[in-house]
Amino acid sequence: MTCPIILDCDPGHDDAIALILALAHPDLVPLAVTTSAGNQTPDKTLNNALRILTLLNRSDIPVAGGAAKPLARDLIIADNVHGETGLDGPALPNPSFSPQAITAVELMAQQIRKSHQPVTLIPTGPLTNIALLLASHSELHDKIERIVLMGGAAGVGNWTPAAEFNIFVDPEAADIVFKSGIPITMCGLDVTHQAQIMDEDIERIRAIPNPVAKCVAELLDFFMIYHRDPKWGFVGAPLHDPCTIAWLLKPELFDAQDCWVGIETQSELTLGMTVVDRYQLTGKPANATVLFGLNRQGFVDLLVHSLAAYTPTYLNRR
C-alpha cells in the first residue's frame, strides 16, 4: 500500500537526509516538497530543497517556498549548526528546475485536494506552513491522514533549557497544530538524541559506491563538527529529522506512547516547551503519539540500505 506524503522542511543537514531517505522508498509517494525558514533563511532552505532533488534527479516533484517568518515572532535561524548555506559540506549541484509560482500552503492544499488517498504531512522544521494550511483549509482536515513531525521534547530542550528549536521558533504555529485534532506522531529530542550516527557509521555510508551516499557522508562530516562539543554528551551526531521517515517505514524500531501534548506560548522561561503528559496527570485525552525509544542499530541499517538503493539505474530511471 502506497503512502502519499508531503515533506515540509527547512534543509538543513538532517532535513536533506530525511528527504533522501524518503525518496529511496517507492511506497512513499511524494506529492510535494515545501520549505520553511528555520535552519537557514527562507531563500536558502528553498534553494537547498531544489539542490537535493536535483541530486536525486527528482525534478518531477513540485516544490514551493513557504512563510518567510513565524506567525507572530521574528525569525530565528540555526546557522551555527548548518553553516552559511544551510547545507555546508558537500559540493551539491545547482538546481536544475524552478519552484512553483505559488506558496507552500497553496501547493499543499492543491495536492491534498487532488489526492485519492489521505495524505501524510511530514514537517521537519518550524510548523508555520502547516499551521497556515490548517487554519485556511479546514475543509481538507479529513484528507490528512496524519502529521509526523520532528519537534519538541518530553525532557530538556536544545535551544533553550525547556524548548526544542523547531517548536521554539514558532510556538503559536505548534499550538495550532497540536490542537487541530489531526493524528500526530511527535519525534522529539527524547528519541532523536538516540538516533546518533557514529564515525564508523559515516565510513559505512561513504563506502557505498554512489554519489548520493557520498553526499550524505560529507553532510555528516560537517554535521558532526557542531555535535562534538562536550556539552551535549554525544558520541555521534543525532539525526533528528530522518526519524520521521524511519517511523513511517519501520515503526517497530520505536517505542511510543499516546500522550496529551500542550505548547507553552507565554512563559519567559519555558516558551516553546512541549508539555508532555506521560503520566495522564491532566486528565486530558491524548493528542499525539510520542516516540521515546529507538533501536539505533536498526535505524542506521535502514539508512544504509536505503542509500544503497541509489544506483545509477535508479537515479537515471526518469
UniProtKB/Swiss-Prot annotation:
Query: Which one GO biological process term can you cite for this protein?
Result: pyrimidine nucleobase metabolic process
Q: Key word Lipid biosynthesis present in the record?
A: no
User: Keyword set for this entry?
Assistant: Glycosidase, Hydrolase
The chain's disulfide connectivity reads none
Q: Which Pfam families match?
A: IU_nuc_hydro (PF01156)
Keyword Hydrolase attributed: yes
Q: Where does the record place the catalytic residues?
A: H240
Matching entries from CDD domains are given as:
nuc_hydro_IU_UC_XIUA (cd02651)
Cellular component terms (Gene Ontology) = cytosol
- Which SUPFAM superfamilies does the entry link to? Nucleoside hydrolase
Enzyme nomenclature, EC number: 3.2.-.-
Q: What class of enzyme is it?
A: hydrolase
Q: Which residues form the signal peptide?
A: none
**Function as written in the Swiss-Prot or TrEMBL entry:** Hydrolyzes cytidine or uridine to ribose and cytosine or uracil, respectively.
Protein family (similarity comment): Belongs to the IUNH family. RihA subfamily.
Q: Which PANTHER family match?
A: INOSINE-URIDINE PREFERRING NUCLEOSIDE HYDROLASE (PTHR12304), URIDINE NUCLEOSIDASE (PTHR12304:SF4)
Q: Under what name is this protein listed? A: Pyrimidine-specific ribonucleoside hydrolase RihA
Which species expresses this protein natively?
A: Shewanella oneidensis (strain ATCC 700550 / JCM 31522 / CIP 106686 / LMG 19005 / NCIMB 14063 / MR-1)
Gene name, Swiss-Prot/TrEMBL: rihA
